[in-house]
Amino acid sequence: LRIVRHIPQYFYPQRQTKVMNEGCATYVHYTIINRLFDQGKISEVNMLELLSSHSNVVFQPGFDDPRFSGINPYALGFAMMQDIERICTNPTDEDRNWFPSMAGNNDPMGTLRDAWANHRDESFILQYLSPAVIRKFRLFRLSDIAADKFCEVSSIHNERGYAEIRSALA
């Protein structure tokens, strides 16, 4: 019985960091292959093959797509990492409002390293999921009460909705 109990305990931390681990891996891989290509160390043919593979990994089908099976942690993590880089280097007014401490700090790698070292998925999503990524993924929140005949769209793309979507996803 102890072995059966210890196996799930071993994998528990991986479930707490899936978006961050997969997002970090795809972001770093994408960054490295682009730098190598820019330096001429990867041919165009190999680059196209790598980008095709990468695109397949980070693909997020829409909720109405037959392939949809939930949010792809690779896609969400990668999008969030890229968005953090954008916020640090080229913020919008909305970014400055939502992320005053990192917007325009011009240190995306420092910001990402801090996030990787100090957050699990729940706190990472609560801290860094931006309205831009929420819109890109077309995220919304449904309230589905079994006794009710219909589902209610309870959080949409507005200030209150962004915060509620972040909280629900975390």
Enumerate the predicted regions with their spans.
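Inter-helical turn/loop segments and adjacent helix faces that build the functional surface
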Residues: 11-15, 35-44, 91
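Sec-exported extracytoplasmic/periplasmic mature domains
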Residues: 9, 30-34, 85
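Short, charged/polar micro-motifs that form catalytic or ligand-binding hotspots
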Residues: 11-22, 66, 70
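An active-site-proximal "capping" alpha-helix that borders the catalytic cofactor pocket
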Residues: 20-33
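Non-catalytic terminal regions of proteins
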Residues: 45-170
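Active-site-adjacent bridging/hinge elements
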Residues: 1-8
